[in-house]
UniProtKB/Swiss-Prot annotation:
InterPro entries named in the record: Ribosomal_bS6 (IPR000529), Ribosomal_bS6_sf (IPR035980), Ribosomal_S6_plastid/chlpt (IPR020814), Transl_elong_EF1B/ribsomal_bS6 (IPR014717)
HAMAP family noted in UniProt: Ribosomal_bS6 (MF_00360)
Signal peptide: none
Disulfide bonds: none
Pfam families: Ribosomal_S6
Stated role: Binds together with bS18 to 16S ribosomal RNA.
The keyword Transferase appears for this protein: no
Domain of life: Bacteria
Originating species: Tropheryma whipplei (strain TW08/27) (Whipple's bacillus)
Record's keyword terms, sorted: Ribonucleoprotein, Ribosomal protein, RNA-binding, rRNA-binding
Gene from which the chain derives: rpsF
Molecular-function annotations in GO: rRNA binding; structural constituent of ribosome
Name used for this protein in its record: Small ribosomal subunit protein bS6
GO cellular component entries: ribonucleoprotein complex; ribosome
């Protein structure tokens, strides 16, 4: 969606716990295809390995990464597609910041 306004989003990404050492670089690589569309990563925070409340895709824990970014709606759709295609990603949650 070219021309749609940039909005701020917060994305929680859970990766397999075996990816803890390279979690930041793996998550950053997911944004490479959409950077030309104006997506800007404002902040990326690796929270470390966390236990899940229930089993997800046969796993009980994973590395949690929180990403704050600016993007338009079309870019967010592409980011979601990239996340679904990446086997390392266990679960994602996307929130629009500042929305009531």
């Amino acid at each position: 969606m070219l021309g749609s306004p940039l909005r701020e989003y917060e994305l929680l990404v859970s990766l397999g716990s075996e990816f803890e050492p390279e979690a930041e670089s793996r998550v950053r690589s997911l944004f490479t295809p959409v950077e030309p569309e104006g997506v800007t990563v404002k902040h990326l925070d690796v929270l470390g390995v966390r236990k899940f409340a229930y089993e997800i895709k046969g796993r009980n824990d994973g590395v949690c990464v929180v990403v704050r970014l600016l993007a338009n709606a079309g870019s967010i759709a592409e980011i979601g597609r990239q996340m679904r295609l990446t086997e390392d990603v266990i679960r994602t949650k996307l929130l629009r910041v500042g929305r009531k």
